[in-house]
Each structure stands twice: as C-alpha cells, then as structure tokens.
Amino acid sequence: SYQSRGCKVYCFHHGNDASFSKNEFGHQLSTSHCKNFIVPTKGIAKRYSRDYSSLHLEKRVGTEYININSNYMYSMFTKNMYHSNSLKNIERIVIMGYPAHTYRYSCEGGMFFYHKSDLEYRLIKFIKSLGVNVCYKAHPDTLESTKGLYEGIVDEIVVKNFEDSWKATDLLLFTYTSSSTFGYALTTNLPIVLVDPSLELRDREDVILMQKRVNFIKAKVNKIGRVIFNKEELASSILSVNIKQNFEYVQEIYGVSV
C-alpha cells in the first residue's frame, strides 16, 4: 500500500539464505512485490537476482536486490574456525528436524512433515545400527509436538539454539537446505551430510561449490512421497569422517566485497 502510493519501502532478507533451494512460488508470494529488497552480501544479491529477476512480477515491479555488504556471517565463520575439530571417529550426530506442521513447500523434494518424519525415523534407526549416538535438533516452531514423536527413540532431543549447541556434536545431518540453520552450519568446521532428493532443482555451479563442503547422499522421492536414500553412501560418509574443509561457497556467499 505505501509502495503503491510512491513511498520508498524496504523489505529485509530472512537470513542465511543464498537461494541454494530455489523457491519461485514462495518468493513470488513474499518478496517479488518489493521494489527494494535488502540482502546482507553481494554473493546473496547475485544469486537472488539470478534466480528471481526474470519472474514476470519482478519485471513489472522492478525489484532490486540491495547488498549492504554485511560482514556478520563471515565474522561468525572466522570465529567458528577456532573450534577444535580433530575427529577420528564420529560418536554423536545431530539430525536437523523439520517442523511438524501442515504446510507443504515446493522448493525441495518431500517437504511435508509426514514424509519428513518418516525419513527422519528411518535415518535415526539406520544410524543407531552403526553404533553412533543420534540426537534430534527439534525445530523451535513445533517443539512440543516433536518431543512426543522422538522421545525414547533418539539419545537426546536438542532444544537449545543451534548457534549455542553445535560444538557438542561430531557431525550435522540435514534433509533439506531451505533453513537458516543450514546457512549457519556451513560456517562451522563440522562435517555436514545432506540427504538430498532435490539435486536437479539446484543451480549447477552452486552444487559444484557446495559438494566441496558438504557430503551429498543420493536420494529420490517415490510415487507415494517417501524419500529413498542410499544407505551405503550414508554409512560411508559417517564412518569415514570426511570433513570436507573447503569453504569456497561460504566465502562466495558471505564474503565482504571491497
């Protein structure tokens, strides 16, 4: 309303997202109507423009992605590198939980709580069969309902903020990337595993960079929405302790331009 009356209106980036999960539908609902959209870094502005500026609504509105050249996330990355990480064996894994609500998202495969809960349960059982402790980082939006799902199945349900709890684990396991937690996790020096049924939806050049930092596990969504993952690849990623300390992607999206 203010924008249509000629007022200069600024909208703000959610945080830690660099469009690794392209979300054209959600983006058009929440962002494309904004003329001035503030993002923290040049790398993020570049990717938002790449993925969304060709949308009809953005062409009509003239959406501009404005980089404020923030060094906040890069300073976190620099600080997190001081964390001692000389792993020989993976003893404790944290699975990043999906919110147990009724929303469906189209930006990645299997983005519905029923399918995610089914996947998370199978991952927990399989990883525990390898002799590794499994903790579950509950999504804060649906904390109480999640507790009832996983109590007695995992070794611990983590309720503290990720930023305050990541140092207490050996490996981080994600089943989706459209989360501010994933963006922060990239700035740590912990090994990261991603069970990813959405490879074909991602930008090829970003995937090449991300594969230098993250261990991708092949997965697909079958006809009934179940995510099928490669157990051998997952076991190898856990037991071989492949940390992947290449941070080109982090430097690309969070680095400050001079």
Language-model features, listed with the residues they occupy:
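Active-site and donor-binding regions of nucleotide-sugar-utilizing enzymes
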Residues: S1-N67
